[in-house]
Amino acid sequence: ETVICIEQDSELIDFSEKIAIQNSMNNIVFIKNELKKGYPDQGPYSCILIEGAIEEVPDVILNQLAEGGRLVTILNKDENGAAMKFSRINNEVISQFLFSMDAPLLEGFKKSKKFKF
């Protein structure tokens, strides 16, 4: 199977491509795109891994999950981090707490501020 890696940093893509070639990892494709958008052109995906903490999973990424697909990430809520698994079952997304942990917040994944009365 092909592994699609999304990165917004061109230098990191270049570095990663060199490492993949040196290690004969021929099934990896690196794509420059905003992380929070994912890459719907090749979806739906059976597995999505967001490596870093986020404050919310954007719907645009959840919509890229195939039926039976899973997304794993670290969700930060109120200064507390949790490894979470999101699964698409019967066209609904179900979340499951895995364990507590912290990681740096990924750029572009801050929760959008909402107006409150």
Predicted regions and their residues:
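Substrate-binding/catalytic lobe of Class I Rossmann-like enzymes that use SAM or dcSAM, i.e.
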Residues: A83-F117
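Conserved nucleotide-cofactor-binding alpha/beta core module
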Residues: E1-I94
